[in-house]
């Protein structure tokens, strides 16, 4: 059961789609419950490049994101429309849905990707005072980072909470360099909020004229607004592309850049996930053996290690530090093959099939 608009540019929708595909691929019947939101004129399975299809049930009443009272009503009607008496297992990210499933004693897995601070008062009351996460109907609680696990163990959960970092579903392929490129293609994929470091990429591109920069993400309007103040020709903007097109675009990139700021906002440019983030795109970069240049945020150290599988920038607010590393890479990218290979091997082993198998193992 998912609350997310689908298909859409939201990472949560992509992760849910790929999870359902993997469960279907290993032989289980899947019914995904969704609100009637998202880019409904586009084919869901084509948008996410899904080969192993599954049933989708849309609740027509909810033609916009379920909020307020509709948040609670959506959970209730989702379970009702799922033919709950015949379902063996549920998976959800929604606290209230988990609460209702526990009330009717339906076994389920609860995935947590965010801090509880973004939830409403009633949900906080359910978790902190009623201890709903300790209910026996929850077979497993999964967080995407150790920092998030530590946050929730404060509410008394110990035995059934595990960490499963996000994982990529892309085909694994590592680019080989037979000679050093004259110009590096440096790429960013994702939201173009300032917290994701778009201003830093623009600033770097203006100074570093020897390389090309590519930004994939945001709406056409957002891109037009940004380009008004840019005159250099070595930076290229493209609006959000469907996941089915990511592999091809990413294959042409040499260095993937993630210049996060100390505060990382989410959809709507709100909140702060800098302590708990596990970016899905990071694992896509690794799966294709890309050299990753990233801000050194503590939470990312759960997966990224400086000069082992990535290059991490400590003083990430200073463009000179980024330029210094880019200059070193430009001199000889082959020198970084060992770092790229380490990232590639990790993502190849810990792919979305591996993650799904761990999720469903009891």
Model-derived segments and their meaning:
Residues 1, 142, 168, 179-196, ...:
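Conserved donor-binding/catalytic core segment of Leloir-type glycosyltransferases
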Residues 34, 113, 131-132, 136-174:
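Donor nucleotide-sugar binding/catalytic pocket of nucleotide-sugar-dependent glycosyltransferases
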Residues 8, 196, 242-250, 256-287, ...:
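Nucleotide-sugar-dependent
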Residues 215-217, 224-255, 265, 307:
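Nucleotide-activated donor-binding/catalytic signature segment of Leloir-type glycosyltransferases, i.e.
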Residues 2-10, 22-73, 147-153, 163, ...:
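N-terminal strand-loop element at the rim of the active site
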Residues 40-49, 53, 57-90, 96-104, ...:
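An amphipathic, basic-hydrophobic alpha-helix
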Residues 171, 317, 321, 331-362:
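A charged, aromatic-enriched C-terminal amphipathic alpha-helix characteristic of glycosyltransferases
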């Amino acid at each position: 059961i998912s609350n997310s608009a689908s298909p859409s540019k939201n990472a949560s929708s992509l992760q849910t789609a790929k999870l359902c595909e993997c469960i279907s691929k290993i032989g289980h019947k899947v019914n995904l419950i969704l609100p009637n939101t998202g880019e409904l004129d586009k084919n869901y399975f084509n948008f996410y490049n899904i080969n192993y299809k599954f049933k989708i049930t849309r609740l027509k009443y909810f033609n916009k994101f379920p909020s307020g009272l509709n948040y609670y009503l959506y959970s209730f009607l989702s379970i009702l429309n799922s033919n709950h008496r015949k379902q063996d297992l549920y998976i959800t990210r929604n606290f209230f849905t988990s609460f209702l499933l526990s009330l009717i004693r339906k076994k389920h897995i609860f995935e947590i990707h965010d801090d509880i601070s973004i939830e409403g008062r009633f949900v906080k009351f359910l978790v902190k005072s009623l201890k709903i996460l300790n209910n026996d109907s929850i077979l497993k609680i999964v967080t995407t980072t150790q920092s998030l696990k530590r946050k929730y163990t404060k509410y008394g959960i110990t035995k059934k909470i595990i960490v499963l970092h996000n994982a990529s579903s892309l085909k694994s392929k590592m680019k080989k360099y037979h000679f050093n490129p004259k110009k590096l293609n440096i790429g960013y994929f994702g939201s173009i909020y300032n917290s994701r470091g778009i201003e830093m990429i623009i600033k770097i591109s203006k100074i570093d004229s020897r390389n090309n920069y590519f930004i994939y993400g945001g709406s056409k309007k957002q891109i037009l607004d940004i380009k008004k103040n840019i005159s250099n020709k070595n930076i290229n903007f493209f609006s959000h592309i469907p996941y089915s097109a990511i592999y091809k675009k990413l294959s042409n990139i040499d260095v993937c850049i993630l210049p996060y700021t100390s505060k990382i906002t989410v959809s709507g440019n709100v909140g702060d996930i800098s302590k708990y983030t596990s970016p899905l795109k990071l694992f896509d970069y690794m799966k294709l053996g890309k050299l990753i240049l990233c801000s050194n945020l503590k939470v990312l150290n759960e997966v990224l290690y400086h000069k082992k599988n990535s290059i991490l920038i400590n003083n990430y607010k200073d463009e000179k530090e980024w330029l210094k590393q880019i200059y070193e890479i430009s001199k000889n990218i082959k020198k970084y093959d060992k770092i790229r290979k380490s990232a590639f091997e990790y993502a190849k082993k810990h792919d979305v099939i591996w993650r799904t198998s761990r999720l469903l193992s009891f």
